[in-house]
C-alpha cells in the first residue's frame, strides 16, 4: 500500500503508473551504470527525486481537478 502525502485520494491507476515510472527509472539507473549501485546510493537517488515527485503529485492533482474530481490542494511536506 502506497502512502500519498497530502489530503487527497489519487486513483490506484495513477499510483500504479507512477510506481512503474519509478521502477523504470531504477532499472535504467542500473543498466546505465558501469558500477554496481549500492543500496544506499539507490536510496539517495530516490530521495533526490523527492521534489520531482512533489511536482508530479501537484500536476496529477491539477489534472484530477480538471477532470472533475473533488480534490483538495496538496500541502508540500517538509
Swiss-Prot record:
> For this UniProt entry, what is the primary localization, expressed as one broad class?
other
Q: Which family does it belong to?
A: Belongs to the class-V pyridoxal-phosphate-dependent aminotransferase family.
Q: EC number(s) in its UniProt entry?
A: 2.6.1.45, 2.6.1.44
Is Transferase one of the keywords?
yes
Full protein name? Serine--glyoxylate aminotransferase
Identify which top EC class this enzyme belongs to.
Answer: transferase
> What regulates the activity here?
Inhibited by aminooxyacetate.
Q: In which tissues is it expressed?
A: Expressed in leaves but not in root tissue or seedlings.
Cofactor(s) recorded for this entry are: pyridoxal 5'-phosphate
What's the source species for this entry?
Triticum aestivum
**Cellular component GO terms, alphabetical:** peroxisome
The subunit field of the Swiss-Prot or TrEMBL record says: Homodimer.
Record has Cell membrane as a keyword: no
Amino acid at each position: 500500500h502506497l502512502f500519498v502525502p497530502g489530503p487527497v485520494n489519487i486513483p490506484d491507476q495513477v499510483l500504479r503508473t507512477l510506481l512503474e515510472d519509478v521502477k523504470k527509472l531504477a532499472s535504467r539507473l542500473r543498466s546505465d551504470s558501469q558500477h554496481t549501485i549500492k543500496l544506499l546510493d539507490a536510496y539517495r537517488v530516490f530521495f533526490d527525486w523527492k521534489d520531482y515527485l512533489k511536482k508530479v503529485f501537484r500536476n496529477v492533482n491539477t489534472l484530477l481537478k480538471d477532470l472533475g474530481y473533488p480534490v483538495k490542494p496538496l500541502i508540500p511536506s517538509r
